[in-house]
């Protein structure tokens, strides 16, 4: 037998073995799964928008099903009860993260987003302490200042009758909030959006986002073919790290323990200056994830207002009924009195959830979900946030903020009925939960920031900045497209899902 035949026999054996391994059942309670191919598993079933592919598979295989993404055994959750099992009820068993190579380069698994449970506990405690000691009023002031700067820039476009290109300006807005909050730095009002700090951050960010989750994360033998792209990717990540390190070192020199000026000062004090790498990586988490999530949601808000002029008109009328026609700036105190506006933001989160698959998790031990399905140790878990907001609501592709108003009214009526049942000593149905039970239960099926202890730590800040910029854009400008054409609302998948770039015609109100 010559060497070539030996290699061919080995490859054939490997293919057959891998096919059997990927398709064998561990127990009678395994989640359902389509047939997996050897080597690639179910990668062929994923499109350029994997959240949509996974949602289509959920229509066939149900709210909990399994796939092999390359060699990674994965369970996809598009079920309310199972979602709660993973994020809350069995949180500790699903608290770890998978460790793909692309993420190792970014965080070394020491930051906040991708650290395993033990490291995450320490880091979360550190960040929570720093956030608690930083006054909420300070955050609100930072957000309002950046909102004013953005509106001023938009006014310049409106006065010149020029089309406004929202992406770079909303990116600058989102970055500035995080830079101000973390480091007391900002990209200057008159600083070009194409040069300086903006360029130094956005180019590495954009390149880093393109690499995360690529095929060589799941098929190890392809790594040699990605050698040069991986090398360039590492360079971009190190550029971001060195940018952060410069700021950290300067803060350490200027630190006043009695008067910390920003979140980075608080983190250095809380860590006693002993966790430099962790603190820097936490800052990278905020910059990489937070800025993109906020920017994407703000872009979708503008797009859906343009495509739904009746919604835009109704929201504006509500806003001026609260703030008055002479008001030129909406504050956080105004927002709570604008239920229709809040419903628009919630509908944006539902229909185009910025993180459609959340952050993946890993099961630490063998376990069973509340529906009886078996999850073996080491299984990757994908939380299909997009799918729940799509499959479990009526008319999912329709942008209907009214559904949230109606839902709130229905919930209030339901609570009154339940209270009446209790008063009448009637039994309340406690049948086993199912997706059918939760259909159109919007607060349960729409979870853009996930649930449980490992949800988004910056959720409150993200919501405040989104509410501020969106309400003030609405107050100051009527938004429309070129020639009043409908803007394409098909998404582009990435760390967040973004619309294709578009331009806005701004009409000053």
Swiss-Prot record:
List, alphabetically, the PANTHER family matched.
Answer: CYTOCHROME P450 307A1-RELATED, HEME-BINDING MONOOXYGENASE FAMILY
Q: Where are the transmembrane segments?
A: 1-21
Q: Which GO terms describe its cellular component?
A: membrane
The record's Gene3D superfamilies line, in alphabetical order, gives:
Cytochrome P450
Can you provide one Gene Ontology molecular function annotated for this UniProt record? iron ion binding
- What's the source species for this entry? Dictyostelium discoideum (Social amoeba)
Instruction: Name the chain's protein.
Output: Probable cytochrome P450 519B1
> Needs which cofactor?
heme
Compartment(s) where it occurs, according to its Swiss-Prot or TrEMBL record: Membrane
This protein's gene is called: cyp519B1
- InterPro entries xref list: Cyt_P450 (IPR001128), Cyt_P450_CS (IPR017972), Cyt_P450_E_grp-I (IPR002401), Cyt_P450_sf (IPR036396)
Membrane topology of this protein:
Single-pass membrane protein
Q: Is Iron included in the keywords of this UniProt record?
A: yes
Q: What is the lineage of its organism?
A: Eukaryota, Amoebozoa, Evosea, Eumycetozoa, Dictyostelia
Record's keyword annotation contains Repeat? no
Protein family according to the UniProt entry: Belongs to the cytochrome P450 family.
């Amino acid at each position: 037998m010559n060497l070539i035949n030996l290699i061919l026999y080995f490859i054939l054996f490997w293919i057959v073995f891998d096919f059997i391994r990927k398709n064998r059942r561990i127990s009678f309670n395994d989640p359902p799964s389509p047939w997996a191919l050897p080597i690639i598993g179910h990668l062929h079933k994923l499109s350029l928008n994997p959240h949509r592919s996974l949602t289509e598979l959920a229509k066939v295989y149900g709210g909990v099903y399994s796939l092999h993404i390359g060699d990674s055994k994965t369970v996809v959750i598009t079920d309310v009860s199972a979602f709660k099992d993973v994020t809350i009820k069995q949180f500790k068993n699903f608290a770890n993260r998978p460790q793909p190579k692309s993420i190792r380069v970014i965080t070394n698994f020491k930051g906040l987003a991708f650290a395993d449970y033990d490291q995450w506990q320490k880091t979360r405690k550190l960040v929570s302490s720093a956030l608690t000691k930083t006054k909420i009023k300070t955050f609100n002031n930072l957000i309002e200042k950046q909102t004013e700067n953005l509106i001023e820039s938009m006014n310049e476009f409106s006065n010149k009758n020029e089309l406004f290109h929202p992406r770079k300006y909303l990116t600058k807005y989102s970055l500035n909030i995080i830079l101000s909050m973390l480091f007391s730095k900002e990209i200057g009002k008159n600083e070009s959006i194409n040069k300086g700090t903006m360029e130094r951050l956005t180019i590495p960010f954009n390149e880093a986002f393109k690499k995360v989750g690529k095929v060589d994360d799941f098929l190890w033998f392809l790594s040699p073919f990605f050698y040069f792209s991986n090398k360039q990717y590492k360079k971009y990540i190190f550029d971001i790290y060195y940018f952060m390190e410069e700021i950290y070192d300067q803060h350490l020199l200027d630190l006043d323990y009695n008067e910390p000026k920003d979140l980075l000062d608080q983190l250095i004090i809380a860590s006693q200056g002993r966790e430099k790498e962790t603190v820097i990586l936490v800052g990278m988490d905020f910059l990489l994830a937070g800025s993109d999530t906020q920017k994407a949601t703000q872009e979708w808000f503008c797009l859906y207002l343009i495509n739904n002029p009746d919604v835009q008109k109704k929201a504006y009328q509500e806003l001026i009924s609260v703030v008055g026609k002479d008001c030129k700036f909406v504050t956080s105190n105004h927002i709570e009195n604008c239920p229709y506006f809040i419903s628009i933001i919630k509908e944006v989160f539902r229909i185009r959830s910025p993180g459609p698959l959340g952050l993946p998790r890993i099961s630490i031990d063998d376990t069973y979900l509340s529906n009886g399905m078996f999850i073996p140790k080491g299984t990757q878990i994908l939380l299909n946030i997009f799918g729940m907001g799509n499959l479990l609501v009526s008319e999912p592709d329709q942008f209907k903020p009214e559904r949230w108003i109606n839902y709130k009214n229905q919930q209030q009526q339901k609570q009154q009925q339940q209270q009446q049942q209790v008063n009448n000593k009637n039994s309340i149905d406690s049948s086993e939960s199912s997706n059918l039970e939760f259909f159109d239960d919007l607060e349960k099926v729409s979870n853009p920031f996930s649930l449980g202890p490992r949800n988004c730590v910056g959720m409150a800040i993200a919501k405040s900045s989104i509410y501020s910029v969106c309400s003030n854009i609405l107050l100051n400008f009527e938004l429309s497209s070129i020639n009043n054409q409908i803007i394409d609302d098909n998404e582009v998948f990435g760390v967040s899902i973004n619309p294709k770039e578009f331009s806005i015609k701004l009409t000053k109100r």
